[in-house]
Regions:
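Arg/Lys-rich, positively charged N-terminal/basic patches that mediate binding to nucleic acids
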Residues: 1-42
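Short, surface-exposed charged micro-motifs
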Residues: 5, 63, 73-75, 86
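Generic, well-ordered alpha-helical segments
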Residues: 29-36, 52, 56, 68, ...
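A generic structural signal for short beta-strands and their flanking turns/coil linkers
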Residues: 40, 60, 68-72, 83, ...
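Acidic, glycine-rich loop-and-strand cores that form catalytic or ligand-binding grooves
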Residues: 42-48
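Short, solvent-exposed coil/turn linker segments
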Residues: 48-49, 60, 98, 105
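A short, surface-exposed loop/turn module that caps and links secondary-structure elements
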Residues: 49-73
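Enriched for short, Lys/Arg-rich terminal
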Residues: 76-122
Length: 122
């Protein structure tokens, strides 16, 4: 079964998304938030295409603007939490879609790059 493949923008982000210890450190010791991050990453990896994530209301998949145009965010846990996973859909050659019309590409995207996990609205 071919699932969504995740590419990480850097090693630090990869460690934060795959290590309970690193994720807990990122969230200031909040182990529940860290476990939620790892669960979100697992769900992304198990999806057939990115559309499977977009249609999940609890993920609150939404586009970003300004300097992050072409990127999207999903909640690490809930909308009440400030933490977001910032990601970008990539084509089969691992290039960003330009333009990135998510409605047109969601059913075919099988690769995403996770740029960062951040307190996006601080």
């Amino acid at each position: 079964m071919i699932c969504v493949r995740i590419i990480y923008a850097n090693k630090k982000t990869e460690k934060q998304c795959n290590s309970l210890k690193e994720a807990t450190k990122l969230f200031g010791g909040d182990k529940k938030l860290a476990m939620s991050l790892l669960a979100r990453i697992n769900t992304i990896e198990q999806a057939d295409v990115i559309k499977d994530i977009i249609v999940m209301p609890t993920f609150r998949f939404h586009n970003l603007k300004g300097k992050l145009n072409g990127y999207f965010a999903i909640d690490v846990k809930t909308i009440r939490e400030k933490w977001r996973i910032i990601l970008q859909p990539l084509d089969e050659q691992e290039h960003a879609f330009d333009p990135c019309n998510i409605d047109e590409i969601a059913a075919i995207v099988k690769i995403v790059e996770i740029r960062e996990v951040s307190a996006h609205y601080e």
